[in-house]
């Protein structure tokens, strides 16, 4: 589902499994040149990442961007805290979400859009174990139905 001029670099598939995502936002990231080069090579891990609101600004924590190989002294700490760029209205909306009990800001996807590194930030509530099991059972039954339909259509031909 990549839009025109958009190249996906990292996807957090586990986020939809662990969280019930209610809304998503597109945010820019404040990066150093060597970090951008490393991200373009796909050397970013957002699985353990999360975002926090501090002083009406949003910061991305625990996202690992591997050091750029030719970066030498210009490389920064791979796990440093990075500021996210959003409009004030979006930040206010996110503050409203996070003040409600149980809501978390989760990085969903990192992609290039017209040469700029963007982050899709999801707002979600953590799923309980029984919710995860229910989702897995639903997906499994859908897979079985599709398999049966495929076999029936092959038999008709």
Swiss-Prot record:
Residues 130-157 are annotated as: Disordered. GO terms for cellular component: cytosol. Gene3D superfamilies: 2.40.280.10. It comes from the Bacteria. GO terms for biological process: trans-translation. Its main location: cytoplasm. GO terms for molecular function: RNA binding. Residues 132-157 have a biased composition (Basic and acidic residues). The keyword Transcription does not apply. Keywords: Cytoplasm, RNA-binding. SUPFAM superfamilies: Small protein B (SmpB). Disulfide bonds: none annotated. It is found in: Cytoplasm. Belongs to the SmpB family. Required for rescue of stalled ribosomes mediated by trans-translation. Binds to transfer-messenger RNA (tmRNA), required for stable association of tmRNA with ribosomes. tmRNA and SmpB together mimic tRNA shape, replacing the anticodon stem-loop with SmpB. tmRNA is encoded by the ssrA gene; the 2 termini fold to resemble tRNA(Ala) and it encodes a 'tag peptide', a short internal open reading frame. During trans-translation Ala-aminoacylated tmRNA acts like a tRNA, entering the A-site of stalled ribosomes, displacing the stalled mRNA. This is SsrA-binding protein. The gene is smpB.
């Amino acid at each position: 589902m990549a839009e025109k001029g958009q190249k996906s670099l990292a996807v957090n598939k586990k986020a939809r499994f662990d969280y019930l995502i209610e809304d998503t936002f597109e945010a820019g990231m404040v990066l150093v040149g060597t970090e951008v080069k490393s991200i373009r090579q796909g050397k970013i891990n957002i699985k353990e990442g999360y975002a926090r609101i501090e002083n009406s600004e949003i910061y991305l924590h625990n996202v690992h961007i591997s050091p750029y190989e030719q970066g030498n002294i210009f490389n920064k700490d791979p796990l440093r805290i990075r500021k996210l760029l959003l409009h004030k209205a979006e930040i206010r909306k996110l503050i409203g979400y996070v003040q409600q009990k149980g809501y978390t800001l989760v990085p969903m996807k990192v992609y290039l859009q017209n040469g700029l590194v963007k982050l899709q930030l999801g707002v979600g509530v953590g799923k309980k174990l029984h919710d995860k099991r229910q989702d897995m059972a639903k997906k499994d039954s859908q897979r079985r139905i599709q398999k049966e339909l495929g076999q029936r259509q092959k038999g008709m031909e």
